[in-house]
A protein has these predicted regions:
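PLP-dependent aminotransferase class I/II
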Residues: 43-127, 133-139
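Conserved PLP phosphate-binding loop immediately N-terminal to the Schiff-base lysine helix
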Residues: 12-35
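A short helix->loop->beta-strand "cap" motif at the edges of active sites that frequently abuts
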Residues: 11-13, 41-42
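Single conserved hydrophobic/aromatic residue that forms the stacking wall/gate
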Residues: 1-10
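Conserved PLP-binding catalytic core of the aspartate aminotransferase-like
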Residues: 114-115, 119, 128-167, 184, ...
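Short, conserved catalytic or adaptor-binding loops enriched in Gly and charged residues
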Residues: 35-39, 125-126
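PLP-dependent enzyme catalytic core of the Aspartate aminotransferase-like
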Residues: 40, 153-156, 160-172, 177-208
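Residue-level recognition of strand-loop junctions within catalytic nucleotide-signaling folds
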Residues: 67-68, 100, 146-148, 189-191
């Protein structure tokens, strides 16, 4: 692993956000940072939750996994001072229910749906939206469109392009907070028929 030795060189811990770890497309595998090697396990704080996968964010059910006892004790102490993000009875039972066998089966089916959605959107964008750059992801339910070339060619700003989408009912997200100066982020966690409809609307009314 190329990044091994980071803990020794920089004397730092790594806080690894793994909340999207369940969303892995067909044919791919996600490696949690702490599972890569023993060194990474000892310097990492793994943050995760069933909230994204099972839509449980309203119940407050995030948690962390810390193998290093020194780091774990420090985090536990700080957490106890604020009582921030403490679980409640509903969130505890929701978490337990989500991690039963039925939850695993449901997640497997969900990943198949997301894979189909992403593959369709990726192929459609590459075929119909000339000048829009997009990469096929290996997981999550987000797709990032780089519209730099398209906006330059058509003489409009990314803000104007975003408004075009919203005006025809395709609600997408500004990509600038995600280090994409002329980007748009699309959420593909929806029925396949709506992905088809969104792509068709964009072709007819936005990327023209």
């Amino acid at each position: 692993v190329r990044s091994r030795g980071l803990g020794d060189v920089y004397k730092r811990q790594v806080c690894s956000d793994e909340i999207h770890e369940d969303f892995v497309y067909t044919g791919f595998r996600h490696n949690v940072f702490a599972d890569i090697c023993e060194e990474f396990r000892n310097i990492s704080i793994t943050c995760t939750s069933p909230a994204k996968t099972f839509n449980l964010a309203g119940l407050v059910g995030s948690y962390h996994i810390i193998y290093n006892p020194v780091i774990r004790d420090r985090v536990k102490k700080e957490s106890s001072l604020s009582h921030y993000n403490e679980m409640n009875v509903l969130s505890m039972y929701a978490l337990i229910g989500a991690y039963q066998q039925e939850g695993y089966e449901w997640t497997d089916e969900l990943c198949k749906v997301l894979t189909k959605n992403a593959e369709y959107a990726y192929d459609y964008i590459r075929s119909h939206f000339k000048g829009v750059q997009v990469a096929m992801p290996q997981g999550t339910y987000m797709l990032l469109l780089d519209c730099t070339e398209w906006c330059r060619k058509h003489g409009i700003t990314i803000d104007e392009l975003q408004k075009r989408g919203a005006s025809i009912g395709v609600i997408w997200q500004d990509g600038r907070p995600f280090h994409s100066p002329c980007g748009i982020r699309m959420n593909l966690a929806l029925p396949f028929s709506l992905v088809e409809e969104a792509m068709e609307r964009l072709r007819k009314y936005v990327f023209v």
